[in-house]
Structure formats: structure tokens, C-alpha cells
Design a protein with these regions (language model features):
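Leucine-biased recognition of intrinsically disordered, low-complexity hydrophobic segments
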Residues: 4, 23-26
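Polybasic, lysine-rich low-complexity intrinsically disordered segments
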Residues: 13, 20-22
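Rhodanese-like catalytic fold shared by cysteine-dependent sulfurtransferases
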Residues: 19, 28-64, 72-112, 119-156
Length: 156
């Protein structure tokens, strides 16, 4: 028996492949679009998550580069890690590309980079992006509230 497939586009242009089992009945086979949960799972699989205590130890050693990927409005509300670079998630690719005039000279592909955000999700996504751009030593310390609660140094 030959297997037939149909492709259907939804109103949101999501492409779904259906396997025909009967001319009247179609079963979804797989979707080509990812959702936020899938992006986060992929990011968390390649960007190690460290505890606030481990992040504080790295901060104290002085050998790591801390980057807050939240926007300035969020940083103004809760502060950030003392000495952290402030590179919003939406601008990271431009700031991390050595070939662009927007490159942030504070970044180095050999640096031990520790990312922070509001809860950990943006930092994970940012870390995956940095790894794909050639930055190898990247980790996610999670959210700023955990950092502050653990006694980490912060600034406005």
C-alpha cells in the first residue's frame, strides 16, 4: 500500500504534513514550526545553567564576563550584576559580531561569559546564539532576583 501525503497551510502559515490513511481522514504527521518551549529546550541543552552561588563565586574570582541581556527599563527596575555589560537580547547578535560597527569591544570569544536576565529564559536563548557565533565558554546564571537573593553584588 502506497502512503500518500498532503501539505496544508493554516491561517497562520503553519505548514503541517498529513499522512492519508483514508481519503476522508487526515492525521497530522509533523509540524515545521517551533514554539517557545522548543527554543528554550534547545538552548538549555547547549548552555549550562549554574546556580547563583556558583555565579557569585565566578564574580568574586574576577575572571568572568557578566552580561545582562534585559532591556534598560527592566534593569532600571531591579538593578543588575555589578560590572555586567548591558546588551539587550534583541541587539546581542549585532554587539557580538566583530565585523559590524556595533561590535562591543568588551566581548571576547575566549572569555568565560556568564549571562543573566529576568528569570533565565532570555539568558539561555542569548547563550545559544553566542555559542553559534563562536563564543565557547558561555553559561546562564538565571534571573537577577535569584542573584540578589543569594547575596550577589548588584548595581543600579
Amino acid at each position: 500500500m502506497a502512503v500518500l501525503f498532503d501539505i496544508c497551510r493554516t491561517s497562520q502559515t503553519k505548514v503541517i504534513i498529513f499522512q492519508k490513511t483514508n481519503l476522508r481522514q487526515l492525521k497530522p504527521k509533523r509540524q515545521f514550526m517551533k514554539d517557545a518551549k522548543q527554543f528554550l529546550q534547545e538552548a538549555n541543552a547547549v548552555v549550562p545553567r549554574i546556580s547563583a552561588a556558583d555565579g557569585i563565586a565566578k564574580h568574586g574570582a574576577g575572571n568572568s564576563l557578566f552580561i545582562d541581556v534585559r532591556d534598560s527599563g527592566d534593569i532600571a527596575k531591579s538593578g543588575t550584576i555589578a560590572g555586567a555589560l548591558r546588551i539587550p537580547r534583541g541587539f546581542l547578535e549585532f554587539a557580538a559580531d566583530e565585523n559590524l560597527p556595533y561590535f562591543n569591544a568588551g566581548l571576547s570569544k575566549d572569555a568565560d561569559i556568564v549571562l543573566v536576565c529576568g528569570a533565565g529564559g532570555q539568558a539561555a536563548l542569548a547563550g545559544k546564539t553566542l555559542k553559534e557565533m563562536g563564543y565557547q565558554n558561555v553559561c546562564n546564571v538565571g534571573g537577577i532576583s535569584d542573584w540578589i537573593a543569594a547575596g550577589g553584588k548588584s548595581e543600579a
